[in-house]
C-alpha cells in the first residue's frame, strides 16, 4: 500500500494559469517525495481566515501565496520569518503541527541570478518599476545583497507607492519617481533611469495573454535610454523573451528572464516544505519546454 501524499498548494485569486504545480510536482516526482501540489483559488480576502483554519485542521503541509493575498495573510499566521517581517509580505507558508509560519522566498529568489554581478551593482543606482509586493521584494533584495547607492521606484500612482512603503523600515534607500514624468521627458527621471545599473520590471505587464497596456507604457524601450552598461531584469516569465528583454538585447544590455526568479523562489519554498534540494536544472528544462509549447 502506497503512503498517502501530503498536500501543498497555491493560494491566490484567478491563478489557474500558474506554473507552480508543474514546478513542484515535477520536483517531487523526480525525487520520489510523497507530496502533491495543487491550486486553491480564493475569491475574496474575507475567506482567507477560513481557508487557513481549514489548512490547520486538515494538516495541509504548506502553501505558496500570490496576488493579491501576500500582505492579507500576514495577520492570520502564528509566526513570521525575519525576511517576511521586513516587508510584511508572505509568499510561503509552512504548517508544523497546526502552527503556520510565513516566509518570503521572493527576496532570495530575486537576488539569486544577480549575485554574480554583485560587485558591479554595489554603490550604483538601480530602478524598480511597480508598486506591489514583487517590487517590495526586489527593493529588499537590493538592500540586503547588493547595497546600491539608491533605489529609484518608478510608479504610476504616488499614493499607492507611499502606502506600500508605510511599514517598510528602510525608506531612506528609496526615491519615488513618476512613470508619467519619465515618458514626458523630464530630465531628472530620464537621468535616473539611464544611470541605473539594473532596471527591473516588477509589474505583470508584458505577460502573454494579458490585455491592457503594453510594457512600453511603463518602461521606456528607446534604444538611447536602454544601453549596454545595464542589466535588465523582467519578472514576467511567459513569454520567455518579453518585449522589454528583446529591446534590452538590441541595446546590448545583459538580460535576466523571470524564469530565474520563479524557479529561485520555488526552490527555497520546496526546501522549507520537504527538507530536500530541488533538482533545479531538470525542473527548468521541463518548465521551459511547457512554456514554449503552451502546454
Swiss-Prot record:
NADP(+) binds at residues 82, 130-134, 235, 258. Its EC number is 1.1.1.25. The keyword Nuclease does not apply. InterPro entries: Aminoacid_DH-like_N_sf (IPR046346), NAD(P)-bd_dom_sf (IPR036291), SDH_C (IPR041121), Shikimate_DH (IPR011342), Shikimate_DH-bd_N (IPR013708), Shikimate_DH_fam (IPR022893). CDD domains: NAD_bind_Shikimate_DH. Pathway: Metabolic intermediate biosynthesis; chorismate biosynthesis; chorismate from D-erythrose 4-phosphate and phosphoenolpyruvate: step 4/7. It is an enzyme of class 1 (oxidoreductase). This is Shikimate dehydrogenase (NADP(+)). GO terms for biological process: amino acid biosynthetic process; aromatic amino acid family biosynthetic process; chorismate biosynthetic process; shikimate metabolic process. It catalyses: shikimate + NADP(+) = 3-dehydroshikimate + NADPH + H(+). SUPFAM superfamilies: Aminoacid dehydrogenase-like, N-terminal domain (SSF53223), NAD(P)-binding Rossmann-fold domains (SSF51735). The active site is at 70 (proton acceptor). Keywords: Amino-acid biosynthesis, Aromatic amino acid biosynthesis, NADP, Oxidoreductase. It comes from Chlorobium limicola (strain DSM 245 / NBRC 103803 / 6330). Involved in the biosynthesis of the chorismate, which leads to the biosynthesis of aromatic amino acids. Catalyzes the reversible NADPH linked reduction of 3-dehydroshikimate (DHSA) to yield shikimate (SA). It holds the Pfam family Shikimate_dh_N. Gene3D superfamilies: Leucine Dehydrogenase, chain A, domain 1, NAD(P)-binding Rossmann-like Domain. Belongs to the shikimate dehydrogenase family. The keyword 4Fe-4S does not apply. The lineage of its organism: Bacteria, Pseudomonadati, Chlorobiota, Chlorobiia, Chlorobiales.
